[in-house]
């Protein structure tokens, strides 16, 4: 089996991030000037390292699609598609609200925050299930290099699963805006080459000998 390269990239910083708002699916989000610059830098670094993208799968949220457009301008992927499994967490009525409200609600109900599910919404375990489902599909396919443009919570959930950690380690696996993880998969066990690297770190971590 040939080695696959899978890049997990969180969308760039949004105006809503700057306001401390939990966006979820309730708020599509618009990239800040800094967020756009970060995504352009990530795309340029990957292109300079010689990464040839066979497919780019993208969250349907506007912040994800805007980020993907900036990446695609540098990487010219052969195939770009929206995949609903990469969507942000459906937080129900908590979407668009200050982040601390979810923690307060979980405490009132006496449940771990990753199991909190608002009416009609999702828990973090639900998000993990769909991200893992997409991961399995990508790994079973023939594409050599795939970029997944998603959200911090979903990427953290997937990283917990890949590393065998529980949700008590969730916060340690959440990427910053435009954070990038690079995973090689060529057998039974994935190899994480980079985890949640920042755009500023990338030039010293990627080169044409190692990134493809």
Regions found by a protein language model. Name each.
Residues 1-5, 48-49, 77, 89-100, ...:
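Acidic, low-complexity terminal tails and accessory targeting/binding regions
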Residues 3-5, 9-78:
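Active-site-proximal alpha-helix that buttresses catalytic centers in soluble enzyme cores
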Residues 6, 142-150:
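Generic beta-sheet signal
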Residues 14, 154-155:
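Short active-site segment of divalent metal-dependent hydrolases/proteases
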Residues 16, 29-30, 73-132, 193-197, ...:
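Phosphate-handling substructures
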Residues 49-52, 138-144:
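Glycine-rich phosphate-binding loop signature in dinucleotide/nucleotide-binding domains
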Residues 58-59, 129, 149-150:
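Short beta-strand scaffold positions
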Residues 70, 157-161:
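Active-site signature of alpha/beta-hydrolase-fold catalytic machinery across serine-
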